């Protein structure tokens, strides 16, 4: 069984409550779940949020929409993933994040299929893909090993960091993009990110609700002003801050 775990919380430091912001009349997190529901490789899909009361509304919103919810540690996200996976005992786990409302289910399937075909412990995407399509796949055994061995705060907060830091201990694979679109930013961390996502949905969703990466790229070619809306924001800023904080200590 392949379990898709979408991690999300309400307490974003840069854009609090972003996952519940209305996007074409529906909470952003539900838009992402609706897209992930189209994945053919994922057997079961669950939202993993925290047990903190501030995430009560998030959990209730997602459950009311008919999706499974697991609640665990706020800060030990690796532990939250592992205990969530324990409930379902999958063979593989697909890691997804709640700040990617234009995630492409076809790419999720591509990464998952390659992971299985190559018998990898862990498979990720290169940064040649636009930021906001993030998909990682790992075996349950690899997740368990990371849970048991990861000690640094950054490795508990960022679920797959321990695996990526120890490639000698895992069979690791990557999925590359045919062209380099790494400068494009389709994730939501800042107000200008959400402004861009709103425009993408307004332009594409009415005609094609499950629009793809290629559809967005075509839209950007037709309207070059879109790329300027959220220029200049650092990729993976949260991860870089966590690692920098440990170096200071």
PLM ranges: what are they?
Residues 1-49:
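N-terminal glycine-rich phosphate-binding loop and ensuing alpha1 helix
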Residues 30-91:
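Conserved N-terminal catalytic core of the sugar/cofactor nucleotidyltransferase
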Residues 42, 89-90, 117-121, 170:
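Short, high-confidence coil segments that cap the C-terminus of an alpha-helix
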Residues 83, 104-130:
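Conserved donor-nucleotide/metal-binding helix-loop-beta segment in metal-dependent transferases, i.e.
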Residues 87, 110-121, 139-155, 165:
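Basic phosphate/pyrophosphate-binding loop/patch that engages nucleotide-derived ligands
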Residues 138, 160-249:
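Conserved alpha/beta core of the MobA/IspD/sugar-nucleotide pyrophosphorylase nucleotidyltransferase superfamily
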């Amino acid at each position: 069984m392949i379990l898709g775990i979408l991690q999300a919380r309400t307490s974003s430091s840069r854009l609090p409550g972003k996952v519940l912001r209305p996007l074409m009349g529906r909470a952003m997190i539900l838009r992402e779940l609706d897209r992930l529901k189209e994945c053919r490789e994922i057997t079961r899909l669950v939202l993993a949020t925290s047990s903190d009361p501030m995430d009560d509304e998030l959990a209730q919103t997602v459950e009311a929409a008919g999706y499974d919810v697991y609640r665990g540690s706020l800060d030990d996200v690796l532990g939250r993933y592992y205990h969530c996976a324990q409930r379902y005992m999958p063979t593989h786990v697909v890691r997804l994040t709640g700040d990617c409302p234009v995630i492409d289910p076809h790419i999720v399937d591509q990464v998952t299929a390659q992971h299985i075909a190559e018998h990898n412990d862990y498979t990720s995407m290169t940064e040649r893909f636009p930021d906001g399509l993030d998909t990682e796949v790992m075996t349950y055994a690899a997740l368990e090993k990371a849970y048991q061995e990861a000690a640094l705060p950054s490795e508990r907060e960022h679920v797959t960091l321990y695996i990526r830091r120890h490639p000698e201990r895992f069979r690791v694979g990557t999925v590359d993009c045919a062209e380099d679109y790494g400068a494009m930013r389709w994730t939501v961390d800042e107000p200008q990110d959400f402004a861009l996502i709103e425009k993408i949905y307004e332009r594409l969703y009415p005609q094609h609700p499950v629009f793809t990466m290629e559809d967005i790229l075509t839209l950007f070619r037709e309207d070059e002003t879109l790329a300027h809306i959220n220029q200049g924001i650092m990729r993976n800023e949260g991860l870089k801050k966590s690692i920098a904080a440990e170096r200071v200590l």
